[in-house]
A protein has these predicted regions:
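A compositional/biophysical signature of low hydrophobicity enriched in polar/charged and small residues
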Residues: 1-160
Length: 160
């Protein structure tokens, strides 16, 4: 389990501000959190070193780059029965890392083993991914799909 980093109120204000605009200058950030720019810089560097801030990215709406269909796939894997066979979970995890359509993969408790978030151009692209990639993988036993009709809430910010 990861070590829990102690954050004070100023750290939390810095994190909230950077989650809303990761490109703001240290001067602007310092003004927002009521610190000097040098003190703000020190805190941000510490948060980066402690991996509280894991990185900075550009957020790209999939629809703006031709990926208009989002699906959530519940995937069930076969249960391995032979001792010499490689674990189906290991095989599946390695494969998922190579599939560009999969933008998120979570291991689950319950009836299904994994939940995938997949972004594709359209239903034809989805069908190719399912038929030619996912269902042909030797560890996949079953999958069930739900398509996104509307995103009611979509944020990358965590409540700090």
């Amino acid at each position: 389990m990861e070590q829990n980093i102690q954050l004070d109120a100023i750290d939390r204000r810095i994190l909230r501000a950077l989650q809303s605009d990761g490109r703001m200058t240290y001067d602007v950030l310092a003004a927002q959190v009521s610190l000097s720019p040098s003190a703000t810089l020190r805190r941000v560097k510490r948060l980066e070193e402690d991996k509280v801030i894991a990185g900075y990215v550009a957020l790209i709406p999939p629809e703006r780059v031709g990926l208009g269909l989002t699906a959530y796939l519940n995937v069930r894997l076969e249960k391995h029965s032979e001792v010499h066979k490689r674990n189906p979970m290991d095989l599946f995890r390695a494969a998922v890392l190579t599939w560009p359509e999969v933008v998120e993969c979570a291991a689950l408790t319950g009836e299904m083993d994994y939940l995938l978030r997949v972004v594709v151009e359209d239903m034809a692209h989805y069908s190719r991914f399912i038929m030619d990639t996912l269902l042909k993988h030797p560890s996949v036993q079953d999958c069930k799909t739900s398509f996104v009709l509307d995103r009611v809430k979509n944020t990358t910010a965590v409540p700090v």
